[in-house]
Amino acid sequence: MKLEIERKFIVKSLPKVKPDDIYEIEQFYFKNDKGIWERARTYHSEKSGNMYIHTIKKTVSKGVNMEDEHELTKEQFDNFKNKCFQKGIEARHISKERWVYKDGNLKWEVDKFKSGYHLIVAEIEIPNKRYDIKFPKFMEDIILLEVTGIKQFSNRSLSIKIDNIL
């Protein structure tokens, strides 16, 4: 498990500079038999190819999570995805484009949602909770509102319930 400290902002547009990478992301969530939400995510970019990641997050405090993450094979990802469509499973789905911008030792991840929302959210993972973010020029003019720790803006909350009643 690793500690993840991040800040999240609603932005009015994508930055007007060229990103370092762009990913197509699809995420599936389901609540396991212990009542814990699990996530499987697939990333695809021309630079990095395909990646499949399984994650369980536990909220520690506002903007701070413990994260248990490991890589999946495509077959394991497909099995997870298929489980989300089984009868009686509480499951959710979201898809988005992620635009990645390096900023010194940090990186901004700007997500443009495809799943029915006209919403763009920027996140930055920081080394500690007291870290003073210096907004780079490309982010200064587009940030509208900080939403760190507001549950309604978590990816899982923004995801769409899978209708798996067969």
Locations of the language-model features?
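Phosphate-end processing signature that detects enzymes handling 5′-triphosphorylated RNA
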Residues: 1-166
